[in-house]
From Swiss-Prot:
Full protein name: Mitochondrial distribution and morphology protein 34
Entry text on domains: Lacks alpha-helical transmembrane segments, suggesting that it resides in the membrane via beta-sheet conformations similar to those predicted for other outer membrane proteins and porin.
PANTHER family, A to Z: MITOCHONDRIAL DISTRIBUTION AND MORPHOLOGY PROTEIN 34
Assigned keywords, A-Z: Lipid transport, Lipid-binding, Membrane, Mitochondrion, Mitochondrion outer membrane, Transmembrane, Transmembrane beta strand, Transport
Similarity field: Belongs to the MDM34 family.
UniProt key word Ribonucleoprotein: no
CDD domains: SMP_Mdm34
Primary role: Component of the ERMES/MDM complex, which serves as a molecular tether to connect the endoplasmic reticulum (ER) and mitochondria. Components of this complex are involved in the control of mitochondrial shape and protein biogenesis, and function in nonvesicular lipid trafficking between the ER and mitochondria. Mdm34 is required for the interaction of the ER-resident membrane protein mmm1 and the outer mitochondrial membrane-resident beta-barrel protein mdm10.
InterPro entries: Mdm34, SMP_LBD
Single Gene Ontology MF annotation: lipid binding
Organism in which the protein naturally occurs: Schizosaccharomyces pombe (strain 972 / ATCC 24843) (Fission yeast)
Entry superkingdom: Eukaryota
Location of this chain's protein in the cell: Mitochondrion outer membrane
Gene Ontology biological process terms in this record: intermembrane phospholipid transfer; mitochondrial genome maintenance; mitochondrial membrane organization; mitochondrion organization; mitochondrion-endoplasmic reticulum membrane tethering; phospholipid transport
Gene label: mdm34
Length: 452
């Protein structure tokens, strides 16, 4: 969708051209200039012409009575013109003396042996633009125009040195580079400042609030210390009306010690010390954001040593005791929520595994100190059938062989013989597992003997 702008030439008054000329002059003299330019650049004439630009609406982001945000496609091929005046330094060439007699040549100055400052007029016309423009309008903040790409297609440059082709080509190239920088950097600032002036003049009831601040070292502000450059009014309004040829965008003085924003930032930086481990309670296995890296490594190493020292040698703990399926740590951490860990997660129950290791007796005569190695925390009242594996690795068929190789008293064998019939009568032991059952009962008795 596109629209036309009616009354383009009637919208700009003489005061507008004066203000635009002043701001454009300050923008052209900003920064470093070329070494050939010997004086300030002055805008002598500015004419936007009767032909308006063409705008095509691509997107409308926000629309309200006091604000607007949209994306436009800008096309302009009008008769706007700009005339500049400055002084340049000519590069004189030292021409060698010719052997031609003087009567055969004209008495004209061919070159200069010293630098010359020559005035120059520069005229820009036949401007053609085509680009994407982001327009943001706010009645309280002004108008912001930003070009997403390079809008310049072509421009005609005419100067006082058009008779010299080398200088004409050089000026054409340099002016195009400067116009690209003007459209992308300086023009948005000029439009913003002028929009603040328009809104301040059209509506004097705009509420621009200023935050009152009293210096801690000074209870009141005297007239002697009052800065006339900082007047009460809309933000940037009075600053925009003052023009500095060296610095067009002027900012007011900022007191680092007493400015409220600087003090707020300093207070926020000091409040970060509350997160240090020195002033906050220490949580095991937690990594603090303000903790140095060497402290983190030392803290984790100490805690891992404490955990390994507490575990019993007769009990093995699996990895699930410390790490869950979805958790990276088993204790509270500031990164717990990012991994799906709840703040009130219940601590998992420690799982114990009883490990029974049986060593086979050698062919030589075994010593009386050889016993079965197993866990000492074995309950004799537990059913022996529950501890028998489904597929035993080895079946002992001769109990007398165990009696020969190991020192077993008659009292131990009687307890074993009393335990076996009780299990058989209850129907818990099958015929295939009978020998393995006897071996396990003997191992339990030997383990109980070692625990006394």
């Amino acid at each position: 969708m596109s629209f036309r702008v009616k009354g383009w030439s009637d919208q700009f008054s003489e005061s507008f051209y004066e203000r635009a000329t002043t701001l454009l002059t300050a923008a052209l003299n900003k920064g470093t200039k070329h070494s050939m330019i010997a004086d300030h650049i002055t805008v002598k004439e500015l004419d936007l012409g009767p032909q308006p630009p063409q705008l095509e609406i691509l997107e409308v982001g926000d629309l309200a009575p006091d604000r607007f945000q949209g994306l436009f496609n800008l096309h302009y091929s009008g008769d706007a013109s700009l005339v500049l005046q400055t002084k340049i330094r000519a590069n004189p060439l030292s021409v060698q003396k010719s052997n031609v007699p003087s009567f055969s040549s004209r008495n004209t100055m061919l070159a200069s042996r010293a630098p010359l400052t020559v005035p120059m007029f520069l005229r820009l016309s036949d401007l053609k633009l085509n680009g994407i423009v982001v327009l943001v309008f706010s009645k309280q903040k002004g108008i912001t125009v930003v070009f997403r790409n390079d809008p310049l297609e072509s421009v005609r440059v005419s100067s006082s040195f058009d008779s010299i082709p080398a200088i004409a080509r050089f000026l054409q190239r340099e002016i195009e580079v400067q116009l690209v920088s003007l459209f992308q950097e300086e023009l948005p600032s000029i439009i913003y400042k002028m929009s603040r002036i328009w809104f301040a003049k059209s509506d004097s009831n705009l509420s621009f609030q200023k935050i009152p601040f009293t210096s801690p070292n000074q209870s009141h502000t005297s007239l002697a210390n009052y800065n006339p450059d900082l007047l009460d009014g809309p933000p940037d309004y009075h600053e925009s009306t003052k023009v500095d040829t060296h610095l067009p965008i002027k900012m007011g003085p900022l007191d680092v010690q007493t400015h409220p924003n600087i003090r707020s930032i300093a207070s926020l930086a000091l409040s970060r010390k509350a997160l240090l481990p020195i002033s906050s309670p220490s949580i095991p296995m937690s990594i603090y954001r303000s903790t140095p890296p060497d402290t983190i490594i030392q803290q984790l190493t100490t805690q891992s040593d404490d955990i390994s020292a507490v575990s019993s040698p007769a009990t093995q703990y699996s990895a699930s005791d410390y790490l869950g399926s979805n958790d990276t740590t088993a204790r509270p951490s500031i990164f717990g929520r990012s991994h799906g860990t709840s703040q009130f997660r219940r601590r998992e129950r420690v799982k114990k595994r009883h490990v029974i290791k049986i060593h086979e007796a050698s062919n030589k005569s075994a010593s009386s100190s050889e016993t079965f190695v197993g866990s000492k925390n074995v309950d004799l009242t537990e059913s022996a059938f529950d501890s028998i594996p489904d597929t035993p690795t080895k079946i002992i068929t001769n109990i007398n062989k165990l009696k020969r190789n190991y020192t077993i008293t008659n009292n131990w064998l009687e307890n074993l013989q009393q335990k076996i019939p009780s299990e058989v009568d209850n129907g818990k032991v099958s015929g295939l597992q009978y020998s393995a059952f006897k071996l396990l009962m003997l191992q339990r008795l030997m383990a109980a003997k070692g625990s006394f």
